[in-house]
Amino acid sequence: MSSWCSSEDAHNQSSTPSTRSRKSSWLISKIDENEIDKEVQEMMDDWRRSNEAENHVECIKAALEYCRDKLKELLIDEEDTEMDGKETKTKPINIVSNTEFPEDRDVLGNLVNCLDRQQKAARQQMYFDKIVQLGLERQALQDEAVVSTSSPLDECRAEGHEFVMQPVRGGHNPCCEVCMHTIWRLVQWWRRCRVCGMRAHDKCAEEVKRVCAGVLSTRAKFELNTNLCEERSLAEQEYQCAECTAPICFDGVAEQEARLCDYSGELFCPNCHWNDVWSIPARIVHNLDSTPRPVCRAVKQLLAIIDHRPLIDINESTLSLIKFHKELRRVNELRRNFLLMKCYFVSCRTARRLRILQYLNAHSHFVDNSVMYSPKELRELCDGTLLPDLEQIHTVFRKHIEEECETCAGNGFFCELCDDINVDQKNKILYPFTENTRSCATCLAVYHKKCFERKSLNCPRCERRRKRTEIPKTLSSSDEKEAVRN
C-alpha cells in the first residue's frame, strides 16, 4: 500500500504542476498590447531596408496596407467560424490523464473556443487602432510637408498681415473674419496671419481691410492708451461702425447691433465686435481693476500682442496709486532691490555660472529699470499672483549674496556711524537692499538709516576721499613756494 501511495503521490506531483500551469496559461492568455506594434515596426524596418530611396510617408502607407490585410484575414476567419457553427467542434485537449470526469473535457473545450474568439477580437481591435494611428500620422506628415515646402508665393500679404496656408487637420472649424462664414477645413483652403492670428478663407485674404495689429504695435509713435475713454454716441459716429462703416443701431435687427469697445469707447457692428473680453490697461493703471470687459476684434488682437511688453510707466502715471496701494509699493521695492542685486551678480563668477538671473526670465525687463510694467504683470498684480513669485525670487537672490557666495558676501558694508555700545549691530554686514538702511548717493556706502540721519547725512567714506585728494594739492602748492624762494 505504501508503494501504491508513493507512486500515486509521485504521479500527482509530476502531473499536477504541468496541468496547473497549462490551465493558468489558458485562463490568463491575452494579447500583449505591444505585440501588434512590434509586428508592424518590424514590417516597417524590413520595408525601409528594401526601399531605401522612399520617404517615411510611403513607409506608413505600406504599413497601412499590411494592417488592412491582417484585419481582412481575421474578419474572413471569423466569418468561416460562424458558418461552421455547431457542426465543427474543437476537440478538448487531454489535460487530465485519468477519465473519471468526462464532462470536464467539454467545459475546457468551450473555454478554449471562447478564449480563442476573444483573442481574435482583441487582435482585430488592435489592428484597427493601428490603422487609425498610422492614418493620423501620415496626415500630419503630409500637412507638415505642405507647410514646410511652401514657397514665398504661398504667403499672402495684405494690410501688413502675413497670411500662411493652414493644414486641413484641426480641432474645430474657425470663422472667417472677412466674410464671417464658417471655414470648413476639409473642403476649403484657409489662411492665418502669423503675427496677429487673424483667420480668413484663401479667397478672402486679399480683401482684408483691417491693418495688422503687429504693424500698429511696432510703429515708432505707438503708445498704449492708458486714459479712460468716454463712450461715443451713434450720432457722433453717424450711425456707422467705427471700423467697416456698416450701419448700426440699438433697436434694429441683430446684424446691425451696436457693440461698445471699452478700450476705445467706440461702437462696432457684430462682424467687427465678437463680444471678446480683455482687461483694459487704463482701468488697471487708474483703478487696479483687471475685470475683463468687451473689446472689438482689432483691439483684442492688439492687446494680445503687447500683453508681455513693458509699456506702462507706473511712476509717471499713478504716483497716488503707489502711495495708497501696499502691494504695488512692495513690488516697486523688490524691483529696486533686483537692480542692486544685479550689480553683485554681474561681478560674481558663481552667479554667472549658475545663471541666477534666469529666475527673472519671465520678467527680463526687471533688471533694466524699476518703473516699466507690462499689462500682464499689472493684471497678475491685481489677481495677487505677481507678488508671491517676486518674493520667492528675492529670497533666492538674497540667500546667494548673504549666505552661499563668499564673493558676494565680501562686497558688503559695515556701518561706520554706529556707536561702540551696539557692538552686534556695528559688526553686522549691510547691503544696499537690507531693510532700514541708507546709501550714500556719492560713494554708495551703506549705513543704518538712524545712524545716517543722526550724523546729518555726513558720509565718513566721502570725507576720507576728500582729504586724500587735498593732500597732493597742499604738496604741490608748497613745492611752488619753495621754487619761488629759490
From Swiss-Prot:
A zinc finger (Phorbol-ester/DAG-type) spans 160-212, 393-459. Residues 1-26 are annotated as: Disordered. Belongs to the DEF8 family. PANTHER family: DIFFERENTIALLY EXPRESSED IN FDCP 8 HOMOLOG, PLECKSTRIN HOMOLOGY DOMAIN CONTAINING PROTEIN. This is Differentially expressed in FDCP 8 homolog. Coiled coil: none annotated. SMART domains: C1, DUF4206. The keyword Aminoacyl-tRNA synthetase does not apply. Gene3D superfamilies: 3.30.60.20. GO terms for molecular function: zinc ion binding. The keyword Metal-binding applies. Pfam families: RH_dom (PF13901). InterPro entries: C1-like_sf, DEF8, DEF8_C1, PE/DAG-bd, RH_dom. Keywords: Metal-binding, Repeat, Zinc, Zinc-finger.
